[in-house]
């Protein structure tokens, strides 16, 4: 049988555009720059002018909540609600939307609605959450552009809790949907779902050391394996996994116990039959399934015949009511290890009193014993967890408050500061994990003040290099993933940032002392309420230095500056939480703390992606930072210029010069010498980060733009714009 011809080319073909062997297939180690160009406006159907924050402010949130509460008990025949209430399902959906967050790199979380898309929509741990989203569709359809899927999923979780008698801590909207899968998130290297730690490409090494920044124990799980580590039903060992994974999501022991006990107060697990009855996940499902996955052939495939995790049963009686039942049952009974109908390890309570029996979710004539997972039992058998859980059991109000706060943190952790929260239910209380900064209550400096302060700063004797590196160090902690870090707050003067190696503490202290004196002198000279913050001065110093460097090159450039930053206090700074923002590598400063399994250029691209930079922005910043002499420790690597601290395009001109031949000088091939091709004279030294801009074809193409004789003006303007983007990255109040 011959192939039919392509209607476009007229040729026989088995492929269309985008098919065939890819560049990545040919060159699997090729630097992935695609992560810098995700979420293009070309993939977003809402259009460039769409302003979600503005749309959300016009939403009748109370009306949406009323509809969501009504939905909870409107059981649908195609997916019947357990006990006639979808609350447990909606809580799981919201939890799993938020629970992918990990504090190591700030990626994951509920902030983008990514559960709708691959791979999360098809993770084994998210089995049947596609049904939850389909149940929500009528509400989404009704309110349309005024509420994103990202916000709706979290709001549905809140409404589920409230409809079952729980008082939540609050809700902040403002999560904007993405429209294509995220390619920047490292979920692990395993090649099979739920691969155990003894399989190839394991995320574990040594004595069960979990690879950073991962916060889940197996590929396709949100946190832990509920059956125990690698399916081993050991509650104490499971407790170690629970503690590690929750800590990586920024939860302490008290928050962890509150979340587990509070969340498992509702709903049930589903394991009515074996997994061989379950069809493919949404991304692999046939066309006619219309995006629904895990279609089950076991009996009715729904209701009491549902197969999800493989564990079967509820944790306590009254699974649609907020009460202390979970903790009461956990400590009241002894537990026996059994296998669920699906073959999963779980525990059933022994000798259960009638009042603690659980009415079947779909047959009120049946009663079942409460069950616990191995992970649940860690709250009883891990000594630290047990102490907390028993305290909560004895103090219901404390437990309710702890769960409310932990749930709010879980569902809002990746949203950044409170200024990004929208809606009438935003809590008034300021929380330490929100990285608070004081409100600007003083009169801001004007353009005349800015000009005068630039002159004053440049007259202090601080070098261009010192001013640039300090401003960069302050601003470049920003992460677009969870909207943390940045220059606002001037936390570079506080622990832990002031002591980070990458920030060169000795030099930093000198610069900050000098800028603080400028601040004090300026503020003391004001008769009114006008003030300048140190946070603003740090950034302004960098801007002034860049402009001076342009003048040193015989050019002029205006670097934008917008005042309004304030200075946070040490009391407003959670030191342990900020430790994860420490750059272990910063290619923009040619810094790497130690050797890593991934290359220096990959670490650079990762840092650039967190800073929300494009490949051209990353390229022009590298070229500018090198000639500004902004390397860590004033190293000469990559400083391809005879006029350091002059903002020229020399980095690109000399990198692209064919008169230079490069050779590795280290066994790891991370340091290089560039010698004159004819004489052999040493001209330059470089790191992998420097040379990637001449080696990688895409980056070289960009570098060539800035290496042309007519590019100096474009280079200056593009550098100033990219610099301003980094300096302003955390100024959410200006949006």
Swiss-Prot record:
EC number: 1.11.1.21
Keywords: Heme, Hydrogen peroxide, Iron, Metal-binding, Oxidoreductase, Peroxidase
Any one Gene Ontology molecular-function term assigned to this protein's record: heme binding
Essential cofactor(s): heme b
GO BP, sorted A to Z: cellular response to hydrogen peroxide; hydrogen peroxide catabolic process
Keyword field contains DNA repair: no
Crosslink (Tryptophyl-tyrosyl-methioninium (Trp-Tyr) (with M-249)) position: 95-223
Cross-link Tryptophyl-tyrosyl-methioninium (Tyr-Met) (with W-95), sequence positions: 223-249
Binding site for heme b: 264
Keyword Membrane among record annotations: no
Active-site residue numbers: 96
EC class: oxidoreductase
Assembly mode: Homodimer or homotetramer.
HAMAP family, per database record: Catal_peroxid
PANTHER family: CATALASE-PEROXIDASE, HYDROPEROXIDASE I, BIFUNCTIONAL CATALASE-PEROXIDASE
Stated family: Belongs to the peroxidase family. Peroxidase/catalase subfamily.
The protein's name: Catalase-peroxidase
């Amino acid at each position: 049988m011959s192939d039919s011809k392509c209607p476009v080319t007229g040729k026989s073909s088995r492929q269309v555009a985008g098919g065939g062997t890819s560049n990545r297939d040919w060159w699997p180690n090729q630097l992935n720059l695609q992560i810098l160009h995700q979420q293009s406006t070309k993939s977003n159907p809402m259009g460039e002018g769409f302003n979600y924050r503005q749309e959300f402010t016009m939403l009748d949130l109370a009306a949406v909540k009323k509809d969501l509460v009504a939905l909870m008990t409107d059981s649908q025949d195609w997916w019947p609600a357990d006990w006639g209430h979808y609350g447990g399902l909606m809580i799981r959906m919201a939890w799993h939307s938020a629970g992918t967050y990990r504090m190591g790199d700030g990626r994951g979380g509920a902030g983008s609605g990514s559960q709708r898309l691959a791979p999360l929509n098809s993770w084994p741990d998210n089995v049947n959450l596609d049904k939850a989203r389909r149940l929500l569709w009528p509400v989404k359809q009704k309110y349309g552009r005024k509420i994103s899927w990202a916000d709706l999923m979290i709001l549905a979780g809140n409404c589920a809790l409230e409809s079952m008698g729980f008082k939540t801590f609050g809700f902040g909207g403002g999560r904007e949907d993405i429209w294509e899968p995220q390619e920047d998130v490292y979920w692990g290297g395993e090649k099979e779902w739920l691969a155990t730690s003894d399989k190839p490409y394991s995320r574990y090494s040594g004595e069960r050391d979990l690879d950073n920044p991962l916060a889940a124990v197996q590929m396709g799980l949100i946190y832990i394996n509920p059956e125990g580590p690698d399916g081993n039903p050991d509650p104490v060992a499971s407790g170690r996994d629970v503690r590690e994974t929750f800590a990586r999501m920024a939860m302490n022991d008290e928050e962890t116990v509150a979340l587990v006990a509070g969340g498992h107060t509702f709903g049930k697990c589903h394991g009515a039959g074996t997994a061989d009855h379950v069809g493919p996940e949404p991304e692999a499902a046939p066309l006619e399934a219309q995006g629904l996955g895990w279609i089950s052939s076991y009996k009715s495939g729904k209701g009491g015949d549902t197969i999800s995790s493989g564990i079967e049963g509820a944790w306590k009686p009254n699974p649609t009511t907020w009460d202390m039942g979970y903790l009461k049952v956990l400590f009241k009974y002894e537990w026996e290890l059994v296998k669920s109908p699906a073959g999963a390890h779980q525990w059933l309570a022994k000798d259960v009193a009638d009042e603690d029996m659980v009415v079947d979710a779909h047959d009120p004539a049946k009663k079942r014993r409460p069950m616990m997972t191995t992970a649940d039992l860690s709250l009883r058998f891990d000594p630290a967890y047990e102490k907390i859980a028993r305290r909560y059991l004895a103090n219901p109000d404390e437990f309710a408050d702890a769960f409310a706060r932990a749930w709010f943190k879980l569902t809002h952790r990746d949203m950044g500061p409170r200024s990004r929260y929208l809606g009438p239910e935003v809590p008034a209380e300021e929380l330490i994990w929100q990285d608070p900064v004081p409100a600007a209550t003083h009169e801001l400096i004007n353009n005349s003040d800015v000009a005068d302060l630039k002159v004053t700063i440049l007259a202090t004797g601080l070098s261009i290099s010192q001013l640039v590196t300090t401003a960069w160090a302050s601003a470049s902690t920003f992460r677009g993933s969870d909207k943390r870090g940045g220059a606002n707050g001037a936390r570079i003067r506080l622990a832990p940032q002031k002591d980070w190696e990458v920030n060169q503490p000795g030099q930093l202290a000198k610069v900050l002392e000098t800028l603080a004196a400028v601040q004090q002198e300026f503020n003391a000279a004001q008769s009114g309420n006008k003030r300048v913050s140190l946070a603003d001065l740090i950034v302004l110093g960098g801007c002034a230095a860049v402009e001076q460097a342009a003048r040193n090159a015989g050019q002029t450039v205006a670097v934008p500056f917008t005042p309004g930053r304030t200075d946070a206090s040490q009391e407003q700074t959670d030191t342990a939480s900020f430790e994860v923002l420490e750059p272990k590598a910063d290619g923009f400063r040619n810094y790497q703390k130690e050797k890593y399994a991934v290359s220096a250029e990959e670490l650079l691209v990762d840092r650039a992606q967190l800073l929300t930079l494009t490949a051209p922005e990353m390229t022009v910043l590298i070229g500018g930072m090198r000639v500004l002499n902004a390397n860590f420790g004033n190293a000469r690597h990559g400083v391809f210029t005879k006029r350091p601290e002059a903002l020229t395009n020399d980095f690109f001109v000399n990198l692209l010069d064919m008169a230079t031949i490069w050779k590795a000088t280290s066994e790891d091939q991370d340091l290089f010498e560039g010698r004159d091709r004819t004489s052999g004279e040493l001209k330059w030294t470089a790191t992998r980060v420097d040379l990637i801009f001449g080696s990688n074809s895409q980056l070289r193409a960009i570098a060539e733009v800035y290496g042309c004789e007519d590019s100096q003006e474009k280079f200056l303007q593009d550098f100033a714009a990219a610099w301003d983007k980094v300096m302003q990255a955390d100024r959410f109040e200006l949006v």
